């Protein structure tokens, strides 16, 4: 139950990041610089925690560790951030959140390919897992492509984009193909990182060391890209505005605090369990977007959200049943082993007593 509560809280935190990023993107911020600052702040925040609280879990720095950290940093930090924000600039906050719904399907397919997930279609749990994952993907399609009538659920609105440079233009523009591909590419990279964490997460040390290494590599890559693409040093100046808030929030809270929590859920429940909570994030972003970002809420959005949430609960039920079944099987095997040892011990005792 702790992992369920943790992942629901993660979706609220991610939803806040979506809204802040949308406001920042529409304000004309240099996105490469924003990403570089985000991952740098995350590294600066997490590294002292790793040194203080997980000193004994510090991994041995070998060439293998550096290679794993580099791959983890690319898939989990650099590539998703480099693709995601420009993709959001070409779409909307709601669509960007909706696109993450395909993550369970991507993770399930890749998990089956790499034999990290099981799908026993002969069992009720296996069939339900497949149906739940497909429901999430179908709900996302309904959410994006079926509009229906516009729903007005708020009696008043707060327009957070009113003071932005490009607020009205970007809020009402059509979703571009390039933006869709960039956002989807970000989700694919994140799914690969989730599977990588399930496989080699323990080799990167404790959760704090794992996060520090990933963000450190990601920040180094993003800083190099930002410096090579833009030589205007004024773009690197941070003021007391929404850009600083978005950078600190996404860097310290999301990349710093949330990533270790997600890594813990991956280690205890598996990568598919983590991804199926994405629809909750979409519902939150859609509600906030309709209230504060002037993004209209349609009937199709509500229907799609209900379908996706149903898929989430179905997959969570399957994972809980699988864990209970695995625990029961393990206890049964252990009991049989103990009984067998007891029988052998009794037989040995009888043999000694026979003259």
Curated annotation (Swiss-Prot):
Keywords: Membrane, Repeat, Transmembrane, Transmembrane helix. GO terms for cellular component: membrane. SUPFAM superfamilies: Multidrug resistance efflux transporter EmrE (SSF103481). It is found in: Membrane. Its main location: membrane. Residues 12-142, 210-316 form the EamA domain. One of its GO terms (molecular function) is transmembrane transporter activity. The chain crosses the membrane at residues 4-24, 33-53, 65-85, 94-114, 134-154, 175-195, 207-227, 244-264, 272-292, 297-317. It is a multi-pass membrane protein. Pfam families: EamA (PF00892). Belongs to the drug/metabolite transporter (DMT) superfamily. Plant drug/metabolite exporter (P-DME) (TC 2.A.7.4) family. This is WAT1-related protein At1g25270. The lineage of its organism: Eukaryota, Viridiplantae, Streptophyta, Embryophyta, Tracheophyta.
